[in-house]
Structure formats: structure tokens, C-alpha cells
UniProtKB/Swiss-Prot annotation:
GO terms for cellular component: membrane. It comes from Caenorhabditis elegans. It comes from the Eukaryota. Keywords: Membrane, Transmembrane, Transmembrane helix. One of its GO terms (biological process) is protein glycosylation. The chain crosses the membrane at residues 7-27. It is a single-pass membrane protein. PANTHER family: FUKUTIN-RELATED, RIBITOL-5-PHOSPHATE TRANSFERASE FKTN. InterPro entries: FKTN-rel, LicD/FKTN/FKRP_NTP_transf. The keyword Membrane applies. This is Uncharacterized protein T07A5.1. Pfam families: LicD, W02B3_4_N. Its main location: membrane.
Amino acid sequence: MNPRLRVYIFAGIFLFIALIILIKIFFEEEKFDVLVVSLDSKEKTSKECLSNLQSVSIPVPALIIDKTVLKAIYQENCEHIFERKIKIGIDKRNWKLIANHNESSIFECIRMENKTSNDYLQFDTQPARAVLKNFNTFSIGNLHIPSNIPLFLKMWERSEIRGCLNLIVHRNMTKSQQFNHGKEAAEKLAEFRDVLLTFNMFAFLNGGTLLGWYRECGFIPHTADIDLAMFAEDFHPEITHFLLSRTSSFQLLRSLGMLNDSYELTVTPKTGYIVNMDLFLMYKDVHKNGSVINWVGGASNDIKYKYTYPAYDPWCAADLHGHLFWVTCSPQKMLVFEYGNLWYEDHPSSQYDWRSTAKNVRTNGLWSDVELKNVSKLY
């Protein structure tokens, strides 16, 4: 056989084998990949809604924020949208341009602030409100309508702003420990917030992260992780498959508990600033007298723990280093319940035992030997 031909044959065989191996690796790695799609999006509405909205004009861009009108557009039934004024958000930089607009009887114009340093829009309503601004819209003239109306309405329900206290915290025992990357941590937390939103999951600040935001408008310097919670009924288990995929920008480190009992996930960013984030599921118990408590769980070996709260109300919004996060509407009440009346004083993390220090923690039974095999998973 011609030596040159022999070289070509062997090279061809080698390339073929390499191609087969690459294809095999590709499909094995891709088997967990999930296509994340924002649900309920639309870029159009009915002819009736289109005709009605085209019949009015506004000289500057405006965002429809009226809940009734948005629901009508989504349901494609706009017969009654002009029975009262339509609430719209106007960028405050354009406010003077609408001062004498002759359609003022149709619209209730609300100032809207769009700071480039923030990832949210703020509205001068009473009380003030804020929603994330990374949503798509479609336009009818100068009227802009959220493409994903159900998601926007969920954000609006959680948009009432709560402020933090920015207290000066004396740290004689922990002053040498500094969390110097608060902005980077908030940015990664915002990225994880957005991942959860693609699954229609709304998480809220909890535990020490809630305390740090409310007390000092940041993260507690000597904490090592970030705490989030969300209602168990809103959790979508598919997210665990996504977090195990190459597509995810976060790595799933572990899961604890079961979906109906003391479940939590720990994730960390794959790139950039690295900080662990714990996502706890929050459950609801209804007592015989009708009173409601909420709780999140924890576990140490086979012992289960339960952190209880009064009926939880995570329907408000907060700023943390220019990023929007959701929080309880009564932060001080919840912090007193968890940390006691001296919640505003620093407590070194080295002296904090999560199994006993909190005021709202108690044991909650044991995992059985069978359960123990499944309740703790490392990835």
C-alpha cells in the first residue's frame, strides 16, 4: 500500500473515532440541559384592544401599569378599559412634555424613575413602588405593554417599597472581619433571582440576609453565605435539573430535606465572585383555632429543626446595592421574632449556633434511617 495513502487512512480513522467520542460527550453533558422559557408572553392582543388603544395618544413613551387594563389586554377583552383613568408610568425626564397634554382625562400619569445604576424602575405612587426593569414590552404607539403580563402583575403585587435603617453597628468583636464585596455579592444574588424568575419562582430575603439589609442596608460583614426563602407551593422541582446543567451559571452544591419537609438547596456561582446561597422552602401550618404560622427547616445529622414565624407576608420590595429583592412587609416584626428585642446589636457569627441561638428555633423530630439515605445529597 502506498505509504501516503496509509497515512490518510489512519488519519481518517483517528478523526472518525475522535468525532464519535466528542458526540458522545456532548450528548451526555447535554442530557440535563433545560430550555428555560418565560411563560405567558405575548407580543400582540385582540383587534378590539388594539383598536381601543390606538384611538388614544400620548406624546412620550409610557408604560401601562394599570392592573385592570393589563388583565383586560391579557384576556383580550378591552370593552371597558376607558371607564376610568388608565394608570401609566412616565419617565420623570419627560414629565414636562406631558404637562398640558389634552388626553389627561384618559390617563393617570405617574412619575417613573429609571436610574442606570439600578436594575429596577421606581414609581412615585403612594406608597412608592418598584419593579424589575429587565422585562420585554410590545408597543401600540407610545404605549408600552409588558409582554409577560402575568409575571409583571406578580412583580407589581410585590412592588411596595420598604426601606432599610442604615444603623451604625458597633462591632468590637468582629471589626477585623469585613465583607468587602457587598456589591459583587448583591450582583450574584440578583443573577440567581433572575434564574428563579424564569421558573416563575419568587424568593425573598430571609434570616441573616434580611437582618443585614434592614439593619445596615447591606450584608453582615462576618457572614459567609446568603439566605433566601420561598413558599413551598411555589417551588418547581425542575430547577434542580437546570442547576445541574451546563446551561446554568450556578452550580448546585447540595440539597437537604424533602420537598414537603425542611427542604433547602445550596448553590454557588460558577464564575466571578463566589458566595454560597441557601434557598429554603417555607411551609405553612394552620392551627385548630385558624391561626397560621410559617416555618423553614434545618437538619443536623438525624435531628430536624424548625424556625417558626407569624403568618409571613413577603410582598414588598427592597433595594440592596442597587438591586431589587423581595422582603417581608413587616421586617422588624419578623426580626424581633427570630433574633429577639436586641436584633439591632451585632452578634459574632462564631458565637451563633443555628441550632439554638435563634429565638424561633426548636427541634422538629428525627429523620428515620430510611429517610436519611435520601434527605442529604451532595452534587
